[in-house]
Amino acid sequence: MEVKMDELVLDVDVEEATGSELLVKSEPEADLNAVKSSTDLVTVTGPIGKNGEGESSPSEPKWLQQDEPIALWVKWRGKWQAGIRCAKADWPLTTLRGKPTHDRKKYCVIFFPHTKNYSWADMQLVRSINEFPDPIAYKSHKIGLKLVKDLTAARRYIMRKLTVGMFNIVDQFPSEVVSEAARDIIIWKEFAMEATRSTSYHDLGIMLVKLHSMILQRYMDPIWLENSFPLWVQKCNNAVNAESIELLNEEFDNCIKWNEVKSLSESPMQPMLLSEWKTWKHDIAKWFSISRRGVGEIAQPDSKSVFNSDVQASRKRPKLEIRRAETTNATHMESDTSPQGLSAIDSEFFSSRGNTNSPETMKEENPVMNTPENGLDLWDGIVVEAGGSQFMKTKETNGLSHPQDQHINESVLKKPFGSGNKSQQCIAFIESKGRQCVRWANEGDVYCCVHLASRFTTKSMKNEGSPAVEAPMCGGVTVLGTKCKHRSLPGFLYCKKHRPHTGMVKPDDSSSFLVKRKVSEIMSTLETNQCQDLVPFGEPEGPSFEKQEPHGATSFTEMFEHCSQEDNLCIGSCSENSYISCSEFSTKHSLYCEQHLPNWLKRARNGKSRIISKEVFVDLLRGCLSREEKLALHQACDIFYKLFKSVLSLRNSVPMEVQIDWAKTEASRNADAGVGEFLMKLVSNERERLTRIWGFATGADEEDVSLSEYPNRLLAITNTCDDDDDKEKWSFSGFACAICLDSFVRRKLLEIHVEERHHVQFAEKCMLLQCIPCGSHFGDKEQLLVHVQAVHPSECKSLTVASECNLTNGEFSQKPEAGSSQIVVSQNNENTSGVHKFVCKFCGLKFNLLPDLGRHHQAEHMGPSLVGSRGPKKGIRFNTYRMKSGRLSRPNKFKKSLGAVSYRIRNRAGVNMKRRMQGSKSLGTEGNTEAGVSPPLDDSRNFDGVTDAHCSVVSDILLSKVQKAKHRPNNLDILSAARSACCRVSVETSLEAKFGDLPDRIYLKAAKLCGEQGVQVQWHQEGYICSNGCKPVKDPNLLHPLIPRQENDRFGIAVDAGQHSNIELEVDECHCIMEAHHFSKRPFGNTAVLCKDISFGKESVPICVVDDDLWNSEKPYEMPWECFTYVTNSILHPSMDLVKENLQLRCSCRSSVCSPVTCDHVYLFGNDFEDARDIYGKSMRCRFPYDGKQRIILEEGYPVYECNKFCGCSRTCQNRVLQNGIRAKLEVFRTESKGWGLRACEHILRGTFVCEYIGEVLDQQEANKRRNQYGNGDCSYILDIDANINDIGRLMEEELDYAIDATTHGNISRFINHSCSPNLVNHQVIVESMESPLAHIGLYASMDIAAGEEITRDYGRRPVPSEQENEHPCHCKATNCRGLLS
């Protein structure tokens, strides 16, 4: 019987999302339940377990005598909690070892789904789940019933734990431990898939035997292999409960020679087995998880797809695709339990898929019931598919893929209209990563913005794109001498970075360059071709992918057949998998309710109007006479909306013709309903409005529009001159690389440059638009157009002239000769206005002046090849950061950082100036000899004759000086001089002789270039003495070198190391190097040390007590260490009534330092707090709460799970910070008005652990009693652990508040004063126990704390009975001070 995962998965947080009706129970219902509970208590229950043997007594209810999971109420710590009585086969080994020894009572194992704990419970303290005992641990009985709705949670949890235990063993194996056949990642993926499909303990025993067969025998204990191995195999094949599996797993773990395995793993250059395994092991274990929060909702394919099931995927880091199998295959998986049978499961499963949709199979399906019999088989229908594995081959050989399924993605057709789901996961499957896309789908769609093209991608293309096996590793070597870890390219032995660049074929420019389609072109295509192409479905003249009936019917067809004929009901669907008519009344346009209002009728969020205007929709709706016509209008609007959303997407690379064919196909599926007619009406009505609002022009006939009125009309020119690939080209516009700022004339050259030079995939963020007249850079066309209109109005004038698609001569294909300095100019005979007279012969760019053309030719066409190897840099521009985002950024697909190329952006002005000088010189010598070139015309609008003559004189003077100036050295010149130099004096001397005056300390740049090339130099360091006796010539005008100040030197000034001067005023104070820790707030003067260490050796760092004003005061000094007892651990008060037991798990890490990928504490935290973020907003999935410097990065409001003494790691583990004690240097001092306080003696960085708040742990009753006893003084050492601090309380229902009193027992945290702007933040830290009162309260720096600054925290506001009671004035003196402190 098929059981849905959604009905069997426990969701702890579901009651929070279902509404307030689950949280509060009405009073009449409570009274009725109370009467019912008392009646049921008499009739159902009775004396339980009174015999001394512990056997079932005759009076024991029948519902407790069966050995099966049963939901019941358990009295735990005075309150009734919902739990599951486990079957004996599901009792864990650790629980059995802790069984109570009291023989007079009868006990059973209870599983609490809320805390995932097993515990023994007295049978006298249980009640039937149908009763309503009181008091309960929840807000209502309904919440407790929802927790135990899934009776299989206990078995699934223990089976998941056992499976993870096997995965942990595999994590410790190097590659030499396993056999040769088992060193392929596909083998381990199949092993993991078989383990996740285990339905019984017998299957887990077989998996243990299979795991043993993959390990080499020399790493196993020979005595165990000889004596105990046959019996162990027999026990594995006969395993029937969790206890036997845990014992067999422990025995298998003990027989491995871990010392030899560890020696292999510690050897250098020995890679650990399956590095990919560690990235998705936790995700495999999550398929057994009892939480449903991370599962994405995927639309169910149709009845004749390859898998007739819901696709489940993880949001965080899904690596596998989970598919639901049919019920008819469950018998195969249960009956065939031998090792040979397990390997044949998949072939049997896929071979039986051919007849799953037959009428006989449909009759055999039974409704799902929440019974233990149905729940125990919930994994019988799970199949995990790995891309490229043998399962895909089995699918192909069995002929499951239908020919008619190979043209369009069917998952799009199954999206119900008006579903109203706003948080659906994208259903695109990424073949290269072997997982589903983790982004959220667009509102009203099933794809995200990145995978919109998947709607039009055929299945045959997807199958061809995914290789059967993974590519081999690259054979290249990195610059560090290690082996490259990338995959090699198909057909090569190296990756893209290490492939040989000689003889490589350039990529095809025609297919790599994609431009944005015009709306006008789409409009015209739909208008002219729709009447002819919209044919009834099934006719031979239709497109090939229209022949997919009957399985290819859209959800609109299903809606058209099953929609309610009542005009006042909504047409939306209440289900994602099939069309279920909505029962709500239609309140919007007589078709939709509030929940199912389509996206194209909602308010636009991009600052523009809707794609489908509300007025047009209302006009068309008024013309509909029947409900069928309204449904057809709805379908047409949905097709129109999705088409233009995909067309306007910048990331959609699907050709426009394919998208239009898809729209025509969708409209032709129901030709009788008139969907095509409504679509044509939409096209005719919306064409003019979309053309006007979205910034597109219909052609060159609109070019006479005023530029000042419609700036976006300039885009019309970009689509008229499109002879070659540069369709987005203006005469004044060029392209530049956003990484290195190299200039390019064509976009395709920029794409090749980014891919070959920077080894990254080209994206829009890699491209900058460049203004050719002035060289400025811009992020988008709007900014460039505004700049050109304001700064270069003559360039805008050319946009009003009729565009010329073809240049006069056809010599553009000629290639310039290398090193040629001749400038070829082609005059435009048709241009009579004097604008853009000079045209470049090689690229077609037009220029007003001949020098502009000369500089362009010198910069772009003087290299040996247009797309050759690395040539000289094109120079830096001066408006580098004028981009849309304001800074250089990179797309998410980039795998390399910008650090490797950041140094190239600096110090490039010299190279650019050299190139400009060469161009000016060539223009001066050859400008007068050029034949056939007319001089530039004067523009009387801007300059008069006097100004023009004056400018010519100034330009002649500047040109003469520029020609006499020497060139600046480039990187090659500096590097060549540094290679042959003996010291920095030699470097500067050789460069000055060749290039003249140089910038100061150019030897540092030379040393940096040598370091990048692997040349080791020492002469750049201070104090280096040349072996050849070179002595530097000291310039008296140079400033003294900078010398860092000494620590705590408040008034010291850095002077020259070679001179000893006592005149401090002769040296400018700007020579001092001031750092952050020099600005100390700690007063320096006569400070009296009262105590050298207030902890008296209990802390690893001594903490002194000082009094700054003791010498100026006549009062006797106080001794604050005498009024309390210094302790390093909190004391549990008897009022808590809590046994200090160990409820914290130990991690399975075997090394001295844990890894966040394999540590169980990180895994447990990820399950409890899936939405946790760090202080930068990033997810905390598979990350420690501390960084590499043991500073906390976890956001406030979440607890910290640290490793404990039971773990195998040492105290140097990254996940051990609080338990290591105080490390910062602190001191207790007397404040002006707040008594004693605590301040820093050194600079404390943000996130550093300062101290722990320690004292006596009390309940609220005892805390209130002590407050009354202490009185209403100005000093209180009681810290309330309420909902604002108790982070663990979010996991527990009705968690009681408690307090920590540091009055008589405490540490230095009792001296921390209050501030409304504190510099500390508190976290609950779990170390020894998961109980909230046993957690530690850690105080961490929330900002950088300077030396001498007081350490403060926020006491918060505690509710008081009256406003005048227990309120004290606040002395923090912060800008946001609240004034009063309660």
UniProtKB/Swiss-Prot annotation:
Component of a regulatory complex with LDL1/SWP1. Interacts with LDL1/SWP1. It catalyses: L-lysyl-[histone] + S-adenosyl-L-methionine = N(6)-methyl-L-lysyl-[histone] + S-adenosyl-L-homocysteine + H(+). Disruption phenotype: Displays reduced dimethylation of lysine 9 and lysine 27 of histone H3 and hyperacetylation of histone H4 within the FLC locus and shows a moderate delayed flowering. Delayed flowering. Zn(2+) 3 binds at residues 1154, 1203, 1209, 1213. Residues 1224-1356 form the SET domain. The gene is SUVR5. In the pre-SET domain, Cys residues bind 3 zinc ions that are arranged in a triangular cluster; some of these Cys residues contribute to the binding of two zinc ions within the cluster. The keyword 4Fe-4S does not apply. Residues 1366-1382 form the Post-SET domain. One of its GO terms (molecular function) is histone H3 methyltransferase activity. It comes from Arabidopsis thaliana (Mouse-ear cress). This is Histone-lysine N-methyltransferase SUVR5. S-adenosyl-L-methionine binds at residues 1234-1236, 1277, 1313-1314, 1355. One of its GO terms (biological process) is methylation.
